[in-house]
Amino acid sequence: MDIDLRLHSGDLCKGDDEDRGLDNVLHNEEDMDIGKIEDVSVEVNTDDSVGMGVPTGELVEYTEGMNLEPLNGMEFESHGEAYSFYQEYSRAMGFNTAIQNSRRSKTTREFIDAKFACSRYGTKREYDKSFNRPRARQSKQDPENMAGRRTCAKTDCKASMHVKRRPDGKWVIHSFVREHNHELLPAQAVSEQTRKIYAAMAKQFAEYKTVISLKSDSKSSFEKGRTLSVETGDFKILLDFLSRMQSLNSNFFYAVDLGDDQRVKNVFWVDAKSRHNYGSFCDVVSLDTTYVRNKYKMPLAIFVGVNQHYQYMVLGCALISDESAATYSWLMETWLRAIGGQAPKVLITELDVVMNSIVPEIFPNTRHCLFLWHVLMKVSENLGQVVKQHDNFMPKFEKCIYKSGKDEDFARKWYKNLARFGLKDDQWMISLYEDRKKWAPTYMTDVLLAGMSTSQRADSINAFFDKYMHKKTSVQEFVKVYDTVLQDRCEEEAKADSEMWNKQPAMKSPSPFEKSVSEVYTPAVFKKFQIEVLGAIACSPREENRDATCSTFRVQDFENNQDFMVTWNQTKAEVSCICRLFEYKGYLCRHTLNVLQCCHLSSIPSQYILKRWTKDAKSRHFSGEPQQLQTRLLRYNDLCERALKLNEEASLSQESYNIAFLAIEGAIGNCAGINTSGRSLPDVVTSPTQGLISVEEDNHSRSAGKTSKKKNPTKKRKVNPEQDVMPVAAPESLQQMDKLSPRTVGIESYYGTQQSVQGMVQLNLMGPTRDNFYGNQQTMQGLRQLNSIAPSYDSYYGPQQGIHGQGVDFFRPANFSYDIRDDPNVRTTQLHEDASRHS
């Protein structure tokens, strides 16, 4: 924002006046009187009482004023930048600003002096009309003008910042008065985490002015070195977006990574619903960095999962500065903290040397796999000359990948191709072979990918963002569509949930396999499974080998004109097919169904019905009865976990919302009555279930005639502090909590505070490893790991992306697809004609 003190009030054009709004600065005298004051404050309505715990470690505690106020001698390129800096400071602290006076040089007529002050500076009650704008431009519709004039209460506050212009043109802070003689306005102050980001940036204003989106003729400091390359205004837009999302839901998480020079390097965020859903779908996660690798203007990295409806869900987004080991390490560590420390069973990434080294360090117990589409793309890139010279190279290469039933078959075909095309000494191919267990289907016998790895990126989850992203997409453009996309995905998930519980699936065949899972699978997955059931009709099995425990069948697939080897272990009830459909998609293929039917089975072995694809993928009920939890900390987090489940169910319909609303209102009243009844804290601690029982009885009486009175005794899972709490000893009483003192935090490395409910002190529950700033962290359903105490009772869920999957099977060409509708007349032959091949 440029503030031109040189313009007189009569010289401002209408366009300038409208564009600047409250930021107009008008001066029409050489030495302004105290009365000529303009209130240029911007109201910040965050209502953000969110606190975030400062983790333990080699850190210093942050106080409100630390490194945030202006410093004498701080330099600025112009008086406009100096004023913008003071404005941001005032926003962070919670007061309004005004330009107190300014002074010109008598010789050059250039401004050489300016004083910016609190809007309550002075002793007289002054009036201005629409911020000193000419009468002709005052709007009668403006509420400020409806009363004729606007009052500006004065308290003789001395808070101000005085800047002077040096001969070299730089503006420096000559004096600064910090103290106010009135209360500040917390409702207008930005959130604590934003305040601390500003504090870190204030050390060097060259970096600070970029973060708060001040205009500058010089090149942005973010474009120098390994820092986040975003335009000046984009970062403030992003920061405002993150603050707004967290104000809507305290479980929204974000983190800002700062370099040693206090420049922003990376930014990460994940919404509340994603963190909640991750507990149910933490088996497979992918990380796509295509937009970073392809040098998009917005270097977006995306963590993606898939829910029970085969809808893709974003589990985290980040803007990263580069593809270095340090950046990826920070990103993965931050994401791991955000989702409660529970690593995924499988993490799929692109083929990258840095990824290969970082993933095992951050996720030692996670199976690291590679996108097959990316492997194939890299083959074409690195062996482009070979591909051009030999038309049969890719067909031979794909045959090795897709049609090698055993490890030795893959190795034999691989080395045969290397010899045939003169690639025995090619280092890239040697390296690719060493990583074969991360991407080759032959080696995926012990992994479940849930449809997350496909042969073409167009079929992959992350291709969804291609509809919204292009090379020149800015942060501002992305933020504009982000909310809409999240809301749409959330509504689609709710629609799928409603269909799942209220609509009966249509049967397509008399197969016992189809019938056995019709009430188990979600509709989306059931339709995919139906394709395999109908496809089994075109398969013919022939037993080739048998021993004491296993039988091997050759299944002829007439639709694909290809044979598939299927192994059946009757003792262990295990079946496997070389097409690897179960490993890649999570449900049995037609070839295995054909063999099971041949072996006289009428139902699918239970281990092949993955819970993640069932209607009960998300646990719908708690079990057990309330137990005595000795600390407020444990009680708070247990209630938060249950509240998340309540939100998930109650948000599906207006009727369920009404039930939950009445129950919560009743519970709050009952709890307040218990807490104010005069009983001492020890009494409450020793009788934690009494209030819960009365609440339950009250809720049942409220809902009589509307809902069933049948009680589901809820058994609480036993809490083991040694297992459920992060590896920092949790206090055993409120008295012990009061004795805790945060360790020191350096500007170079800090987290946002994690603050408990009112009356409790800050708990430091996590320690950082690198320079960063963390947004609020919350206990999540199913994770049972204590990240923090939620600072807000707000149970609104931030919308979540649930991107519909394409459903293109791994070994099937993209130009074929099934369209299963509830049409009993659909012919099996039609399905066969449309079906894609397994390999």
Swiss-Prot record:
Pfam families, per database record: FAR1, MULE
GO molecular-function terms, A-Z: DNA-binding transcription activator activity, RNA polymerase II-specific; DNA-binding transcription factor activity; zinc ion binding
Domain of life: Eukaryota
Result of knocking out the encoding gene: Reduced protochlorophyllide levels in darkness and less photobleaching in the light.
Residue ranges occupied by any MULE domain in the UniProt entry: 284-380
Spans annotated as Disordered: 128-151, 693-725
One example of a Gene Ontology biological process annotation: circadian rhythm
Induction details: Down-regulated after exposure to far-red light. Subject to a negative feedback regulation by PHYA signaling. Up-regulated by white light.
Keyword field: Metal-binding, Nucleus, Phytochrome signaling pathway, Transcription, Transcription regulation, Zinc, Zinc-finger
Presence of keyword RNA-binding: no
Biased composition, class Basic residues, residue ranges: 707-718
Residue ranges occupied by any FAR1 domain in the UniProt entry: 84-186
Main location: nucleus
Localization per Swiss-Prot or TrEMBL: Nucleus
Outcome of substituting residue 180 to A: Loss of DNA binding. Loss of DNA binding
GO annotations of cellular component type: nucleus
Family recorded in the similarity comment: Belongs to the FHY3/FAR1 family.
PANTHER family documented for this protein: PROTEIN FAR-RED ELONGATED HYPOCOTYL 3, PROTEIN FAR1-RELATED SEQUENCE 10-RELATED
Function: Transcription activator that recognizes and binds to the DNA consensus sequence 5'-CACGCGC-3'. Activates the expression of FHY1 and FHL involved in light responses. When associated with PHYA, protects it from being recognized and degraded by the COP1/SPA complex. Positive regulator of chlorophyll biosynthesis via the activation of HEMB1 gene expression.
Domain comment (free text): The FAR1 domain is involved in direct DNA binding, the SWIM-type zinc finger is essential for transcriptional activation activity and both the MULE and SWIM domains are essential for dimerization.
Protein name from the UniProt record: Protein FAR-RED ELONGATED HYPOCOTYL 3
Gene: FHY3
